[in-house]
Structure formats: C-alpha cells, structure tokens
A protein has these predicted regions:
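Glycine- and acidic-residue-biased ligand/ion/polar-headgroup-sensing regions
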Residues: 101-122
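Bacterial N-terminal signal peptides that target proteins for export
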Residues: 1-8
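Ligand-binding loop in jelly-roll beta-barrel domains
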Residues: 129-130, 139-166
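Short acidic-glycine-tyrosine-enriched beta hairpin
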Residues: 90, 121-140
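Bacterial N-terminal signal peptides
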Residues: 9-17
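Secreted/periplasmic proteins that engage bacterial cell-wall peptidoglycan
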Residues: 66-72, 83-108
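A short, N-terminal "cap"/entry segment at the start of jelly-roll beta-barrel domains
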Residues: 19-82, 128, 171-179
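Short beta-strand His + acidic residue motifs that chelate non-heme Fe in jelly-roll/DSBH
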Residues: 98, 116-117, 125, 137, ...
Length: 179
C-alpha cells in the first residue's frame, strides 16, 4: 500500500516543483506570467438569504408585466429564472474582485459607502453609492465593488439568473483601473 502512495507523492512533488521553477524563472528573467485568470474578493463576508425558481415547469417561460400610471415593468425569461438575495458586508478596504453575473443584479447600499467600477470604462470612473442608494448591474460585463471608506458597508443584493446558474463568475483584471 505504501508504494502507490509514494508514487503519487512523487508525481505531486514534480508537478509542484515544475510550477515553482516556472514562476522563479519568470521572475528572474522579468518575463510575464500573464494576467491572472480571475481576481478574488477580500475583506467581505456574504450570506445567501434565499434562492427560488420562478416560472411554470410545463411552460418554461417566465413572464411578468405590470403597468400602473407612469410605471411599467416587464420581465421575460426562457427558460425559468432564479431570484437570489444575498447580504454582503465589506470591511474598510474590502473589495469584490473583478467579476460578472449571468443576469441583472440590483444592489442596495444599506449602510456605509460603496464604489463601483466597470471593466468597459477606459477612464475607470468611480460610481459612488451611499446608504439608501442603489446600483443596477445589467449583467454580462465585468465590474468590481470596493469599500474605499473608513467604515464597514452593508449591501443587499438581488440576483436574477438562469435557473441553477452560478450567481457570480470571476473575471480577470481588465487593466483599466490603477488599483
């Protein structure tokens, strides 16, 4: 039994050694390892409050239309969609990492101040939202949320996504922002 374990350990050590050597060689020569495949969040804690599927399983098309005075809302989804609600608290200096969503996302800043940046904005202009304000992300493009203030910030986030789809898709740093 110990021989197979040793063989697996040896293979793992060779693979890890090869990775270390590549990174070391790149650092020594100044060569680039390329942009990371994604960026990670830091200084935040999220709690999924709930997720539910909306639609008729026999129809597989979800439709809602509401017109009242000057107000009009319409949602159509094929196939059915999920709605998820999440609470995210960002500590001072916390950030979401670059990411995107498969559908629209409604963000309400409950307490504190949040700053949002879009990957497709070459000027990296900040969009600042404070307690009581909202931010709409239409989905499908990368963005980052940052708490650039000195106090915690709490957000309630409502996601609309295809049924059973991931709510967040990590994205590489687009390189348009100085941070």
């Amino acid at each position: 039994m110990s021989a197979p374990r040793n063989k697996a350990t040896l293979i793992l050590a060779l693979v890890l050694g090869g990775c270390d050597r590549t990174a070391t060689e790149a650092a020594a020569t100044g060569a680039s390892m390329g942009r990371p495949l994604y960026t990670v969040s830091s200084g935040s804690q999220s709690t999924l409050l709930g997720r539910a599927t909306f639609g008729d399983p026999s129809d597989r098309t979800f439709k809602v239309k509401r017109i009242s005075g000057d107000w009009h809302a319409e949602v159509k989804a094929t196939p059915n969609l999920d709605m998820a609600v999440q609470r995210i608290v960002f500590q001072p200096g916390g950030q979401s990492g670059w990411h995107r969503h498969p559908g629209p996302v409604f963000i309400q800043v409950v307490t504190g101040t949040m700053t949002f940046y879009e990957s497709d904005d070459p000027t990296c202009a900040p969009v600042v939202r404070t307690a009581g304000q909202g931010y709409l992300d239409a989905g499908e493009h990368a963005h980052i949320a940052r708490n650039e203030s000195g106090a915690p910030a709490e957000n309630i986030v409502v996601y609309l996504a295809p049924q059973a789809a991931a709510l967040r898709i990590d994205a590489p740093d687009p390189g348009n922002c100085p941070f």
